[in-house]
Structures are given as C-alpha cells and as structure tokens.
Amino acid sequence: MRVLILGSGVIGVTSAWYLAQAGCEVTVVDRQPAAALETSYANAGQLSFGYTSPWAAPGVPGKAVKWLFEQHAPLSIRPTRDLRQLAWLSQMLRNCTAERYAVNKARMVRMSDYSRDCLNALRAETGIEFEGRQLGTTQLFRTQQQLDAAAQDIEVLAQYGVPYELLSPAQIAQFEPGLAGGGAQMAGALRLPEDQTGDCRLFTQRLAELAAQAGVTFRYGQQIERLEHAGGQVSGVQIDGRMETADRYVLALGSYSADLLLSLGLHLPVYPLKGYSLTIPIVDAQRAPTSTVLDESYKIALTRFDDRIRVGGMAEVAGFDLSLNPRRRATLEMVVNDLFPGGGDLAQAEFWTGLRPATPDGTPVVGATPYANLFLNTGHGTLGWTMACGSGRYLADLMQGRTPEIDTEGLDVFRYLSPRSARAQREAA
C-alpha cells in the first residue's frame, strides 16, 4: 500500500514510522527543508501523559474575561476577521461544562496513556536518544483554590489508573530541589511520576533518520497546494503544481490541515493556538529543574534537557500570526526567575513561537474521514509531543485494518459531523 503523508512534524513522522513498520510504502512531503521545523521545533518539551487536560474547562469563560486585564495571562484572544475563529471560540465555550470536560479529558487521557506505552516500546526497540528524562512532572499550585480545583482531574487519573501523589509544600523540594532557591510560596503540588521530558525536535529528526533507513521517502521544500477528489475518494494531491497519487493519504499539517480540507467540503474545527518558549543555557544545574515543573497559575512548563531549560506555555487565539510578542517573553522570564533564579543564562535564551493545532474540545482528530482513502492525524493542541507515538500507532492499525489497542470512540472527525452530513459529503464527492 502506497501512503502519502502530508507534514513532517512529530505527528507526520511518527505516522510514517509506524506505517513503514507495518509494511507500507511511505512518502512524506513538507514545505520545510527538514523535519520538525515548525510547531515541533521548540515546544515545552514535556511528555505529559498524566497532565492531560483540555483548555475548555469549567470556569474558563469567567477567567478569560479576567485575563483580558492581566499582564501575564495564560490565555488571550486577539480577534481577527476570520469567521472560523469566532466559530471555534463558540464551540470551545460549549465544551466548558463539567460534563463535557469530563468526557473530553477522558478521551485525551486514553490517548496519552497509550502514547506513553508506545513511546517506551519505541525507545526499547530503537534506542533513540532525544535528551529524554523519566523523572515525572510536578504541577505547582500557588493557591488552595487551585489545589481544590484539581480534585476533578485527580478523579480521572484514578479512573484510568494513572499514578499520582499529592505533595505538601514541604515535600515539593524533595523532587525539585532547585525550587528551594526561589521565593515563590506554594499551597501544594500534584506529582505525576510516569511523565517524561525530551526535545521534540531532536526526537522527530532522529526518528525521521530511522524511518528513512526503513524505506520511508522524505521530500522536503515542496509546497502542498490542493487535494482533489472523485468518487468518494481523494484522487490526488497537487504538489508544486504537479498532481501526485497514492493508495491512501494522511493529513498531518497541524494548524494548516483545515485549509487544505476546504476543497473537499470538509470543515475541520482545528484552529491555531499560538504558544511561546524560551530555550535557556544552564549555568547552575543545582538551581535548574530536574524534570518538568508546571506552574498552574500561568500555565507555563519548565522542562530540563541535558544542559538547557525549556520554558514554554501560554495560548493566544490570534490566527496564523507568527510574530514574537515581547510581553510573552517577559512572562516566561518572570516565571523562570520566580521559580529557578540563577539556573540559566536568560541573556543567551532563544525566543520562539509556534502554532499548535487545537480542537475546541481538546481531543485530537485521528482516523478516517468521509473520504475512503483519506485519514487525519491533527488537532493535538498543546499535547502533540505527548500523543504523537500513540496517535501514529493507532492510525497505522486503523489503516491496516487491524483492531486498535485502545477504544476508538470520539477520536475521529465524525464526532463533529452528523450522520446526514457525513453521508452528504460522501455523495458529493
């Protein structure tokens, strides 16, 4: 089976790896000169198998109004003229109920938990190195209100058997001794011992090398322009002005996936959620994090690589703008100075931004479509690195006609389509 994968971020490359391992003839196409040069380039670096939550949560609508007036707000909305932004925000607000939050979080935890097992198996099989650590995540709560609000998340963790531990303020430094050098006061913390860390770009590029050795063809620097369809199937992809065909197609273009689907009449509610990061050289390892620390107040993660600290987070709903906002840099610097002062050289930090492909309910879109030979692997939001291996393996099983190892409920695009709508799109094709 010939498979054409569109996109060479961590999602596209893991898809290519698992499909090649299943015996498919795989080609990956991307506009960039190498793998992982867009959203996968400098994300926060945490593999948050336990810390998996949708942005659409109870209380967020009220908080969003308050955040409009805060300098260091974790979420900001900058209106554009794109009507899709308004539609996406409307759908997100409808998912901010306790009932929807529980459903969405359970789906996300299901995929994240599976992805951890897939990544661990991949590491054991290939020996791939990506400055990874398996030392867990410490989620910091600055207020008792934040700690109390974590009860619902803890219920889901218990439901899925995800190990966790609640820490008192005095216990936090046992896992992150560098925090003792900061002046921040904490009400407590949630410890997720099975979470991991690692450089997503390094992982993706090294897995691309392994995939190439396994027979995958990577074609970089090529513009993916349009999908064509006929008879209920995709009939080809226009790449650099030339139509190319395959037996099956995988769309893994992150935030740009939705635009490409418009020519098929398929409206995918994936919208860019802009995030920022700083990559900071370590100057004092004793004052740096040992793994991943999550600051619940600012929704910022601080992650340890070998000799660097990656500080990442925030979410701007601002369309496809990739400009660097200096106020966001100030927020990242404020948090790292508050928690780990003196650990890194901020003057030498690399400031970066990327567009995470977010769905309004937080769950990715992985699986089949109304077009028989088109599959999607996108919409992972802030958790693409976390869910990449599980999504890739899950998709490969679906495309090979094998029964996936996890429940498929609610993971594909059909959750957004009524049966009548899906049938009409098939017939129109």
Curated annotation (Swiss-Prot):
Listed GO biological process terms: D-alanine catabolic process
Record keywords, A-Z: FAD, Flavoprotein, Oxidoreductase
Pathway of action: Amino-acid degradation; D-alanine degradation; NH(3) and pyruvate from D-alanine: step 1/1
Names of required cofactors: FAD
GO MF entries: D-amino-acid dehydrogenase activity
Catalytic activity: a D-alpha-amino acid + A + H2O = a 2-oxocarboxylate + AH2 + NH4(+)
Chain residues that bind FAD: 3-17
Top EC group: oxidoreductase
EC numbers: 1.4.99.-
SUPFAM superfamilies in the record: FAD-linked reductases, C-terminal domain (SSF54373), FAD/NAD(P)-binding domain (SSF51905)
Matching InterPro entries: DadA, FAD-dep_OxRdtase, FAD/NAD-bd_sf
GO cellular component: a single term: cytoplasm
Family the entry assigns: Belongs to the DadA oxidoreductase family.
HAMAP family xref list: DadA
Annotated function: Oxidative deamination of D-amino acids.
Name listed for the protein in its UniProt record: D-amino acid dehydrogenase
Organism: Xanthomonas euvesicatoria pv. vesicatoria (strain 85-10)
Taxonomy of the source species: Bacteria, Pseudomonadati, Pseudomonadota, Gammaproteobacteria, Lysobacterales
